[in-house]
Amino acid sequence: TRTIDGVALEFQMVPETEAPAELNVMFPERKTLVIGEIATCSLHNILTPRGAQVRDSLAWAGYLTEAIRIYGDRSETVAASHCWPHFGKAEVRNYLTLQRDNYKYLHDQTIRLMNKGLTQAGIAEELVPPPSLTNEWTNRGYYGTYSHNSKAIYQRYLGWYDANPANLNPHPPAERAKLYVEAMGGAD
């Protein structure tokens, strides 16, 4: 807790979620929690399509649990960077809980399917969130999706290799195309 220019602030560090260094800020006198980007109006990316380190979806869910525990009963407003505010203790708690449940479900079900031997592509096809999560507009995949986020979680734990030896050291696309043409009897 810090007082800056007469305003009391409480900080919750939430590293390795949306960014390597991220934090939430509580304004206790205003009963307002600024949740940063760990709760938004859509499922967030666990790995950005443009590239970055894979984010820790399990820690992400854990920090949302911590925010609910620390601030849930004290917050009457929650504001997020890329979302409209939510008002009322019940709505704040519901919003944060559903966001948390979404990331936890995504993580846990990806791990379950990995343990069943599914590949990244197989998990992306198999994993479908339940209506209890997707009925909430702010949990839907308008930004991040279950498909590419499950692949990111797979990558975080098992890397890029899919256990198919043909994919370990593949030919570049141009060379592979020549080999396909040759295997089909040539260009003529």
Question: What is each model feature region?
Answer:
Residues 8-116:
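Metallo-beta-lactamase
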Residues 69-77, 84-188:
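Accessory terminal helices/loops
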Residues 1-9:
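Gly/Pro-rich turn-and-neighbor structural signature
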